[in-house]
């Protein structure tokens, strides 16, 4: 039954007294309490708060997806104005009616793209299916529109990507596919749950601008769920701050940033890492720990030098990793993705080397190739003086005790059938390191170190938020006391306060045990805080590498400068340069089979600071 007289003028969505709970061991656990808000047509409402504060379950409740997961939802009012201007009460819609509402009138970009995309269908089919269902388009028309949407979200070789499967794409590319799918039907309301978490800063800037452009064209209301206050400052009109399932403050973006009233809001803003905060400092520095009771910043002491002189613990020389692309009636390999091309670097005990670059630049593939999770076609990988790229699988398994990996997608890397205690204890069992009671005590200690409770060991992955699942993955990686940890976007899914705690934990472990980190990230403020050295990757090659201070304070390569310039700043009044969308052809690392790409030539421009000389392929970086 329509409720056209109950929506205020200009509103496209209105929620009153939303309560969400889950049953656990015959006990009702409240996740959201008495939440009320509205969204105007053409407005962006940012919902911010810590991991587990109720942001994502609120979004799932609006999409009517919680009932299937056992969620108990009660609400006085949940009104939506559809694209046809009809106003409906979402809580009264049947499952069949909601299938027509989702996608056409309300769309959602989910936090974890690997678990949101169907692994058995090509991404082009998945985007086209939504277009066919909601726009009555033919298959051919839908595929043309799907290709156009992939172009819009800055995916190179979009025509090729249409026929690829989710597991064949990087995390950032999967996230862009999700964004393309959500925007393809031009909904009245877009709910974006951490949509730029897996994206590098340059693509993030493009996506934020794309959302704003489409929002203006369609007068689309946007609910933007994020923990990145820089993104909030850039995109939001109003901000809703949530803490422990309740709204503690709401107001315009200027009010929240310049005159926050609630202690938690002030603490949240104080914990935001600022690019440039490490200027003049040579070594990594702990994040200030911010509490609700004491939101004032207390600068911690500078970290002492942890890098051990002598031989590197890990040495990589001319690493090459390529993936075949098949085509034609005979399904022959005709082209290859040059994911990693002649990459070389050293990693010393106690050092953090950060790999930064765009999604698809080869960062994650480099990390996976070091553990032989993907096979390389050339180069040498030497760990503690021993070549590991030629080891047998049996010897390689023993070596993995000393090199651990923290994956980008926490839900996909945890077994949904195992409790998280079993997931953390599994490496200890595989390597036969600790008996039962000692292993259980180790699990409890690890959970506490990453900000969780020992009793959480009996829960399953689906019972945690995205940020909490990432903490579980970090605890699992730390279980074996490894010498090297490869952290692939290990803190990208965490809110600012927990992110600071995890970075401080990693620094403490590095100081105490001499762990070396290969830190793969697109968060330049975090990279600046944790790194000893930084390597910038572009199209599978390192184009700049050197001490963190030199790279951040005196970037030499135009791509490095572009990365730093694209970092969002937590200041809503700051003027941002307008970026031209799709102003040029996107470069690609896909080449004909057998075609060799010239390796960039690195030149020394300072102590330990090497830069590739700009070539024609970097011309697209002009501002």
From Swiss-Prot:
GO molecular function, one term: ATP hydrolysis activity
Subunit structure of this chain's protein: The complex is composed of two ATP-binding proteins (GsiA), two transmembrane proteins (GsiC and GsiD) and a solute-binding protein (GsiB).
Claim: Calcium is one of the keywords in the record: no
Annotated EC: 7.4.2.10
A Gene Ontology BP annotation from the UniProt entry: transmembrane transport
Subcellular location: Cell inner membrane
InterPro entries per the UniProt record, alphabetical: AAA+_ATPase, ABC_transp_ATP-bind, ABC_transporter-like_ATP-bd, ABC_transporter-like_CS, Oligopep_ABC_C, P-loop_NTPase
Membrane topology: Peripheral membrane protein
GO cellular component: plasma membrane
Annotated ranges, domain ABC transporter: 15-269, 314-564
Keyword DNA-binding: no
Binding site for ATP: 49-56, 357-364
Keywords: ATP-binding, Cell inner membrane, Cell membrane, Hydrolase, Membrane, Nucleotide-binding, Repeat, Translocase, Transport
UniProt-listed PROSITE patterns: ABC_TRANSPORTER_1, ABC_TRANSPORTER_2
Name recorded for this polypeptide: Glutathione import ATP-binding protein GsiA
Biological function: Part of the ABC transporter complex GsiABCD involved in glutathione import. Responsible for energy coupling to the transport system.
Family: Belongs to the ABC transporter superfamily. Glutathione importer (TC 3.A.1.5.11) family.
Group of enzyme by EC: translocase
Upper taxonomic lineage: Bacteria, Pseudomonadati, Pseudomonadota, Gammaproteobacteria, Enterobacterales
Catalytic reaction(s) noted: glutathione(out) + ATP + H2O = glutathione(in) + ADP + phosphate + H(+)
